[in-house]
Amino acid sequence: MSQKILFIDRDGTLIEEPKSDFQIDTLEKLRFEKDAIPTLLKLKKFGFKFVMVSNQDGLGTPSFPKENFEIAHEKMLDILKSCGIEFQDIFICPHFENENCVCRKPKTAMLEEYIKHELYDKEQSFVIGDRESDMILASNLGVRGLKYGELSWKEIENEILSSFRSASYQRTTKETDIKVKVCLNGGKVSIKTGIDFFDHMLEQIAVHGGIGLEISCKGDLEIDEHHSVEDVALALGACIKKTLGDKIGIARYGFALPMDECLASCAMDFCNRPHLVYKAKFKKSHLGALSTEMIEHFFYSLSYAMGVSLHLKVKGKNDHHKAEGLFKAFAKALKMAVKIESENLASSKGVI
């Protein structure tokens, strides 16, 4: 099973590297880099596993006795363990660069089992290190590299937590072919469903929800818009759900009450018990090429695909504004509900 793994360099990244001899061979030389421990603790709560990958030039030679190395190394591991941080694997290459061994970073021989058995999720794993060789290792593993020194540990934390809140989803049937990409932290907005008014409504979700949203839909519009609207809702809901993963840290609940000349409200709970309460009446049968009855069906399909309990209500005179109000209210509630506000799961059950 693929895991979210951080492949972490040791010297100069996790602990300070002495510029005099580049060896941590005494306890006096052992110092942790600023914010390394609190960052790893936080990332651990979001399901990341840790693997250490380090080059130790000449380890075991007279200039760098193994017993001297192990005194500081074991102390480092003891301190980390006492804080709640453990490495599931530690890989150390003891060779000099001129020995041209098969294991030295950025070569991947030490990580052969991880590659062979696909033990890491390429989209959600990272290499963290302070040297260019670490960045090349990241490329060789097919993951993103984060260079310590150019980034602080807190900036690395932010980069990691923001990057995994995105996902892509494709739904293909005999009636529609839909591709969706969602980035909860913002990004490109491009929506093409073939139904102009529907595109305008979906754009409200992106703009007012502060999310990146790309949707392309090729559907059987020669029949009517039903299949396209329904399947876009199912694909979008599944994609949003995918971005949240195990939902650790999210607020879970959202509520919005935007007002124009109409009053729209939305309450949302990522409870994994899909339900829709919908109260809206329209005078027109269509807004552009979108049937107004399909607005309710869109939110019904969306709520079930997302796994949310959703309450939507709108009152007003202008049908266009009422429809827009519903989508804006949904967007604002979504923005609130998916916000990371803690390091825990918002449930006494331990699962949502």
From Swiss-Prot:
Keywords: Amino-acid biosynthesis, Cytoplasm, Histidine biosynthesis, Hydrolase, Lyase, Magnesium, Metal-binding, Multifunctional enzyme, Zinc
Compartments where found: Cytoplasm
Record-level Gene Ontology MF annotations: histidinol-phosphatase activity; imidazoleglycerol-phosphate dehydratase activity; metal ion binding
Cofactor(s) annotated in UniProt: Mg(2+); Zn(2+)
UniProt pathway: Amino-acid biosynthesis; L-histidine biosynthesis; L-histidine from 5-phospho-alpha-D-ribose 1-diphosphate: step 6/9; Amino-acid biosynthesis; L-histidine biosynthesis; L-histidine from 5-phospho-alpha-D-ribose 1-diphosphate: step 8/9
Active site per the UniProt annotation: D9 (nucleophile), D11 (proton donor)
Residues reported to bind Mg(2+): D9, D11, D130
Identification of the protein by name: Histidine biosynthesis bifunctional protein HisB
Taxonomic source organism: Campylobacter jejuni (strain RM1221)
